[in-house]
A protein has these predicted regions:
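Signature of N-terminal electron-transfer/Fe-S-associated modules in redox systems
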Residues: 1-154
């Protein structure tokens, strides 16, 4: 059985799979990383978004074989309970989630935006998050939280 070594949240992990095209999403869930959600399986909803090599990617569409030797970051690796990432802190303070299903994907996508653009405009935030769907409609709170995390809101 083929074995893939992937570096998840800074830790090398081994994944055994018969299928090199197995989506990264399934491997991450198998490793116990439950922030990564299965939404549509087509890369259209953003619930499965993770950071691979400093880019926001849909893990349901990325074969496990394509991430070998590339750093993968999930929400669990972005911050911790005692030292949350500014986006995590802003989402908590702003009471952004309702059901929470989209939260991980929203935060991971926004984290890449803030790493590339320290003070994004509202239009840039909206453009970056386009394609991350929220069935509860918390888009306004998400936008405010991202602006707060970038130091541009209260």
């Amino acid at each position: 059985m083929p074995r893939y070594e992937i570096r998840v949240n800074g830790i090398p992990r081994l994944v055994d799979t018969l299928d090199p095209n197995q989506p990264l999403l399934y491997a991450l869930r198998f490793l116990g990383l439950t922030s990564v959600k299965y939404g549509c399986g087509l890369g259209q909803c953003g619930a499965c978004t993770v950071i691979v090599d400093k880019k926001a990617v849909r893990s349901c569409m990325m074969p496990i074989s394509s991430v070998e030797s590339k750093p993968v970051t999930t929400l669990e690796g972005l911050g911790s309970a005692d030292k949350p990432h500014p986006l995590q802190a802003a989402f908590i303070k702003g009471q952004v989630p309702q059901c929470g299903y989209c939260t991980s994907g929203m935060i991971m996508t926004a984290a890449v935006l803030l790493a590339e653009t320290k003070k994004p405009t509202e239009a840039e935030v909206r453009a970056a998050l386009d394609g991350n769907l929220c069935r509860c409609g918390t888009y306004g709170r998400v936008l405010r939280a991202v602006m707060v995390a970038s130091g541009q809101g209260t």
